Amino acid sequence: MVGEEKMSLRNRLSKSRENPEEDEDQRNPAKESLETPSNGRIDIKQLIAKKIKLTAEAEELKPFFMKEVGSHFDDFVTNLIEKSASLDNGGCALTTFSVLEGEKNNHRAKDLRAPPEQGKIFIARRSLLDELLEVDHIRTIYHMFIALLILFILSTLVVDYIDEGRLVLEFSLLSYAFGKFPTVVWTWWIMFLSTFSVPYFLFQHWATGYSKSSHPLIRSLFHGFLFMIFQIGVLGFGPTYVVLAYTLPPASRFIIIFEQIRFVMKAHSFVRENVPRVLNSAKEKSSTVPIPTVNQYLYFLFAPTLIYRDSYPRNPTVRWGYVAMKFAQVFGCFFYVYYIFERLCAPLFRNIKQEPFSARVLVLCVFNSILPGVLILFLTFFAFLHCWLNAFAEMLRFGDRMFYKDWWNSTSYSNYYRTWNVVVHDWLYYYAYKDFLWFFSKRFKSAAMLAVFAVSAVVHEYALAVCLSFFYPVLFVLFMFFGMAFNFIVNDSRKKPIWNVLMWTSLFLGNGVLLCFYSQEWYARQHCPLKNPTFLDYVRPRSWTCRYVF
């Protein structure tokens, strides 16, 4: 190879000596365009035409070049992740990537889904938005949202100054939404301490005596029954009772209910992942019982994942500046949502004239609610799934930051459900979908998917009903019926861009419907209260019969 390179180099040198004029022309390709006519002036039109031609050729080659580079880069990253996973997970990773081997044509197979018996594989990786925000074009979109927030603030200040004759720097809506916060704090501490102690104690007590017990089945049923009582009674009814008994405002209720659901899912994952290990240990008659340490369980309770592991990939250091920035962005999103409600939502519903509930009022309300609904959707995603989870991941040096994927590129609802919230999807996939198939049969995949949709829809509707103090199953209908239908109709076989457009259109419309219906019902119950409401009054829509001015 070296000899061939030397010979080719000598041939080129000899040819350059034989044809010095040709070599000179090759080294000066612009000489022809810069030749001056007899009058000594450069032909500007010819120079501009040459430049335009070169620019057009470069633009024509640009997409092919970017596509080729992107393809090779995806291959490189995929191979690198495979090698890293094989080093970290041994045989488990080999099994996983043998499944992915059949997807060679898919260069973006980033979910690294392990077989059900192996569970989720955690790999150190950054969040997608952290990578995208390093690109100037994407960062400009982020700057546009900041500029829009500044305009919201200026608009509020100007309107208040014109109406009141002074600057009104009040956040009455924000202070009302997060009212009675001390109750939230002590309720959270009770939930945390009970989740930290009861599941771990029950599991430890069951595991240490399981192999020596003369009645292991009765022992397992007894401890399982106690665990169910804790999940349903303590974590289930306890926080709900506090929320209703102390009449907490909406945002304070949301914090408690969200943490309630999170602790229930965490406790279930801890028991679900460790019970099979104890059973296998007893089956193999091992002298040691695989019981996690208290520190491992405590770390899991704060880690931004719902899948328990004894250890996770960890980053070497904590970037406290990064943590501060993420928390600042979370608070910025809170104020952003406040100004959206103050400038877009409140005037919309306050200015609806006194007229009965009709299709005309409903249609106008839905389409006027699309813009604020979509903005709230984006801000919720950015504040929680990106900023909040990344802040805790950085403080805990948690390495796997794939809390979401590129859901905005989805051409099907099935892909959207998988990529919008990876944290919750992983829990539903392994502990609801896969366990359903294991318990019944692998032939009932449609029934398993239906069960997962039902569980998710019921939990979402429960959270909204408790937080808003009324039952109005709009989200349940959209999620359980339309969402499930779209999941089967607009499936993964849809790859054309038009399906991405349709997905975004339906997503925009759905958020407008949710914001319109729930806001109308909220204002109706505020302005048309009942003296002695019965249970049916909490589930009967008040906005359909109440005539009032918002």
From Swiss-Prot:
Changing N415G: Reduced cholesterol O-acyltransferase activity. InterPro entries: MBOAT_fam, Oat_ACAT_DAG_ARE, Sterol_acyltranf_meta. An acyl-CoA binds at N415, R418, N421, H425, Y433, K445, S456. Its EC number is 2.3.1.26. Catalyzes the formation of fatty acid-cholesterol esters, which are less soluble in membranes than cholesterol. Plays a role in lipoprotein assembly and dietary cholesterol absorption. Preferentially utilizes oleoyl-CoA ((9Z)-octadecenoyl-CoA) as a substrate: shows a higher activity towards an acyl-CoA substrate with a double bond at the delta-9 position (9Z) than towards saturated acyl-CoA or an unsaturated acyl-CoA with a double bond at the delta-7 (7Z) or delta-11 (11Z) positions. It comes from Homo sapiens (Human). This is Sterol O-acyltransferase 1. The active site is at H460. Cholesterol binds at H137. The chain crosses the membrane at residues 139-160, 181-206, 219-244, 253-276, 320-352, 370-395, 444-468, 475-490, 497-528. Cholesterol O-acyltransferase activity is inhibited by nevanimibe. Changing W420A: Almost abolished cholesterol O-acyltransferase activity. It catalyses: a sterol + a long-chain fatty acyl-CoA = a long-chain 3-hydroxysterol ester + CoA; cholesterol + an acyl-CoA = a cholesterol ester + CoA; cholesterol + (9Z)-octadecenoyl-CoA = cholesteryl (9Z-octadecenoate) + CoA; cholesterol + hexadecanoyl-CoA = cholesteryl hexadecanoate + CoA.
